[in-house]
Amino acid sequence: MEVSTSSMSSKPEQMQNPPPMISSPRFQPQIISPHHHDQHQHLSNPYPTTFVQADTSTFKQVVQMLTGSSTDTTTGKHHEAPSPVNNNNKGSSFSIPPIKKTNSFKLYERRQNNNNMFAKNDLMINTLRLQNSQRLMFTGGNSSHHQSPRFSPRNSSSSENILLSPSMLDFPKLGLNSPVTPLRSNDDPFNKSSPLSLGNSSEEDKAIADKGFYLHPSPVSTPRDSQPLLLPLFPVASPARNS
């Protein structure tokens, strides 16, 4: 019983005089180096794994210290990091060449280009043939086969096939007679008026002046009956009655 009373008497004293709290030092992050038996693996791996022990309050500072840019505490200036292009060129012995893009022509553009090339080639061939034919006509050949200085396709020999392009021909100087003769009012066969048509025109003018209209006679000359014949489409009498 005495022991219990003494313990109870000591409790209020402890409550009145609490023990002083011991302040613990602030936790500092520590970097754990790899073990001795993993040193060979650490040397072979260019990116080793780093284990860090940090407090929750200082974790952000530790991450920034390990991953952030290096700063000089004395001068307060940032060190310039080397450009990644130079590092890549130093580390690798070759560089990737740029990809050359070829111009893709569309189908209709290629067709137009081909047509233009064919037209140019034909024009060049025609000009060469025309020059050669002119040399033969003006300078070459016997005296009996001399052509007139006035060039005309009709005077050229039929054995020579000369291809002439419209751009190379000078039409005013060629003196070509047009195969189509101009039609005059007297020579027009459609304007020839017969005496019957003249009489009809006078009657037509009189009828139009009197009645205001004129009926032309029908040009059909086939004989016709006065009344058209009606075909029996339906039987008039029943077949039973006829039998």
UniProtKB/Swiss-Prot annotation:
Residues 149-162 have a biased composition (Low complexity). Phosphorylated on serine and threonine residues by MPK6. The keyword Phosphoprotein applies. The modification Phosphothreonine is found at T139, T181, T222. The keyword Phosphoprotein applies. Residues 1-16, 84-98, 191-201 have a biased composition (Polar residues). Keywords: Nucleus, Phosphoprotein. Residues 1-49, 69-98, 138-162, 180-243 are annotated as: Disordered. It is found in: Nucleus. Transmembrane segments: none annotated. Pfam families: VQ. It comes from the Eukaryota. GO terms for cellular component: nucleus. A motif (VQ) lies at residues 59-68. InterPro entries: VQ, VQ_4/11/13/19/31/33. Signal peptide: none annotated. The modification Phosphoserine is found at S83, S95, S148, S152, S165, S167, S178, S218, S221, S238. May modulate WRKY transcription factor activities. This is VQ motif-containing protein 33. The gene is VQ33.
